[in-house]
Amino acid sequence: MTPTTLVLGSSSVYRARMLERLGVPFVQEPPDVDERAFDGLLGELGPEGLALRLARAKADSLARPGGSRQLLCADQVGVLEVEGAPPRLLHKPGTPDACVAQLMALSGRTHALVNGVVLLDEATGDARELVDRQELT
């Protein structure tokens, strides 16, 4: 019986290092997903649903018809929820000025980091999903 290949659906060196430290054999394949295209779904899905939807979209982008791999994909959504205002997604700032502005917006407030993880069996289409939410101040 041929062992199943675990595919880490990520371009993150940090996620790859985690699996390496665990001694888990895997191959890394970056998914082709425009994460920002999903921003408008925050109100409908909430942070937890959005994180899972992004992780699943990454797995679906890597799935091959007739494949037999296990696809491990994840996404983290940062969100600032202020009473009386719609939730605000926190993206990677991109510039030093944007970083300062984001840090100022977070100062003295609690924000959430929500992780969605999907393990998709390419052969059956079955998926296991996990969501973790951490509140940070």
Question: What is each of the regions a protein language model found here?
Answer:
Residues 2-6, 20, 44-137:
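Anionic-ligand binding patches
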Residues 23-45, 128-133:
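Short glycine-rich, Thr/Ser-proximal phosphate-binding strand/loop in the N-terminal lobe
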Residues 5-30:
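N-terminal G-site helix/loop of the GST-like fold
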Residues 17, 36-37, 101:
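Short alpha-helical interface patches
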